[in-house]
């Protein structure tokens, strides 16, 4: 009776169908020109990384995609610096234009430091993929602003070298090779300078005999004179030597009395 009254009054519960859930598949991979640009960026960056990145790693988040674009700009700068270094290495250092030699050395050193800094920034980006690191973004922004200028400010390079831990090595090899090439061009001997070798007879002739002090008793004041030992050693026969040893007392080596 209660059910009939409830149905007449509109209080009856009409059974509804259970809700069904359908998986919505969204294609996360870009299509067309965007896909080609991402593949080009991956090709440029993966050549400088210890392990290559995949397209899934890049499109997983917007931050990773943004970092890939920045890494591509750094990779292009690195390639340009490497090409400049290869061209500058073909320069022959001569004395005709010393000012040009200094400019070439300066450009080679700056290009090498800029290339190392770009590579360090790319590696820093690679290590920060999947992590939220504001410091990395700041470093790369500063790097991109610096490399976008027509003239590179080396003070910014020094700051980034200290931040990324890149040590600038002195370019001493250019001066050594420069001096070596000039010496060869002049026909000079570039070997080590050694003193001439003296013969045994020459060495013996240069040996100075020792000097001894001799006291003179003939004068009122005792004076000491220095004579070489060669002048006090006359050549005696064996018989004369035996006579001197019997009649003359032992004479000290340090003093000889002259009569």
From Swiss-Prot:
Domain of life: Viruses
PTM section of the record: Phosphorylated.
Family from the record: Belongs to the herpesviridae UL51 family.
Binding partners and assembly: Oligomerizes. Interacts with ORF53; this interaction mediates ORF53 localization to the host trans-Golgi network (TGN) and subsequent incorporation to virions.
Keywords carried by this UniProt record: Host cytoplasm, Host Golgi apparatus, Lipoprotein, Palmitate, Phosphoprotein, Virion, Virion tegument
Official protein name in the record: Tegument protein UL51 homolog
Location in or out of the cell: Virion; Virion tegument; Host cytoplasm; Host Golgi apparatus
GO CC entries: host cell Golgi apparatus; viral tegument
Job of this protein: Plays several roles during the time course of infection, including egress of virus particles from the perinuclear space and secondary envelopment of cytoplasmic capsids that bud into specific trans-Golgi network (TGN)-derived membranes. Localizes its binding partner ORF53 to the host trans-Golgi network (TGN).
Main localization of the protein described in the UniProt heading: virion
Lipid-bearing positions (S-palmitoyl cysteine): 9
InterPro entries: Herpes_UL51 (IPR007625)
Pfam families noted in UniProt: Herpes_UL51
């Amino acid at each position: 009776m209660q059910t009939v009254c409830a149905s007449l009054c509109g209080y009856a519960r009409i059974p509804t169908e259970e809700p069904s859930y359908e998986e919505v598949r969204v294609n996360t991979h870009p299509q067309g020109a965007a896909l080609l640009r991402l593949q080009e960026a991956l090709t440029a960056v993966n050549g400088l990384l210890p392990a290559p990145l995949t397209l899934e790693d890049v499109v997983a988040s917007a931050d990773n995609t943004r970092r890939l674009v920045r890494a591509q700009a750094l990779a292009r700068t690195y390639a340009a610096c490497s090409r400049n270094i290869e061209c500058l290495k073909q320069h022959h250092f001569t004395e005709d234009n010393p000012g040009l030699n200094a400019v070439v050395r300066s450009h080679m050193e700056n290009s090498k430091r800029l290339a190392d800094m770009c590579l360090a920034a790319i590696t820093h980006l690679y290590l920060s993929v999947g992590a939220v690191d504001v410091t990395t973004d700041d470093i790369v922004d500063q790097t991109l602003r610096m490399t976008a200028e027509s003239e590179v400010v080396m003070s910014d390079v020094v700051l980034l070298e200290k931040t990324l831990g890149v040590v600038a090595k002195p370019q001493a090899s250019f001066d050594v090779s420069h001096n070596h090439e000039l010496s060869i061009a002049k026909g000079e001997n570039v070997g080590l300078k050694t003193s001439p070798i003296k013969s045994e007879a020459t060495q013996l002739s240069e040996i100075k005999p020792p000097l001894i002090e001799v006291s003179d008793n003939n004068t009122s004041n005792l004076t000491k004179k220095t004579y070489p030992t060669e002048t006090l050693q006359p050549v005696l026969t064996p018989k004369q030597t035996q006579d001197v040893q019997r009649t003359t007392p032992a004479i000290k080596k340090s003093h000889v009395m002259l009569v």
